[in-house]
Amino acid sequence: MASSSGAGAAAAAAAANLNAVRETMDVLLEISRILNTGLDMETLSICVRLCEQGINPEALSSVIKELRKATEALKAAENMTS
């Protein structure tokens, strides 16, 4: 009987942890929107995971900015040739 209550407690703790993660991501997404970062939930989630793995947030920000510039340049060049 004790093992089933232990499993129930573990499931409840896992559910509470998942809810906390979701709430944290919702708050981060709202901050991201306020700061007008243009990041969607999936991209923001990837950035958070990269930072958790030790990637420097400032370096990550620089890479994102450079990728956006390169994308805009490619779009502009594509529009010139069409």
Swiss-Prot record:
Pfam families: MOZART1
Biological processes annotated in GO: gamma-tubulin complex localization; microtubule nucleation by interphase microtubule organizing center; mitotic spindle assembly
Compartment(s) of residence: Cytoplasm, Cytoskeleton, Microtubule organizing center, Centrosome; Cytoplasm, Cytoskeleton, Spindle
Family to which the UniProt record says this protein belongs: Belongs to the MOZART1 family.
Single GO cellular component term: gamma-tubulin ring complex
Record flagged with keyword Nucleotidyltransferase: no
Domain of life: Eukaryota
Disulfide links within the chain: none
Annotated keywords: Acetylation, Cytoplasm, Cytoskeleton
Assembly information from the UniProt record: Associates with the gamma-tubulin ring complex (gTuRC) consisting of TUBGCP2, TUBGCP3, TUBGCP4, TUBGCP5 and TUBGCP6 and gamma-tubulin TUBG1 or TUBG2; within the complex, interacts with TUBGCP3 and TUBGCP6 to form a luminal bridge with actin that stabilizes the initial structure during complex assembly. Interacts with TUBG1.
Source species: Homo sapiens
Lineage, highest ranks first: Eukaryota, Metazoa, Chordata, Craniata, Vertebrata
Modified sites of kind N-acetylalanine: 2
Role summary: Required for the recruitment and the assembly of the gamma-tubulin ring complex (gTuRC) at the centrosome. The gTuRC regulates the minus-end nucleation of alpha-beta tubulin heterodimers that grow into microtubule protafilaments, a critical step in centrosome duplication and spindle formation.
InterPro entries: MZT1 (IPR022214)
Protein name, entry field: Mitotic-spindle organizing protein 1
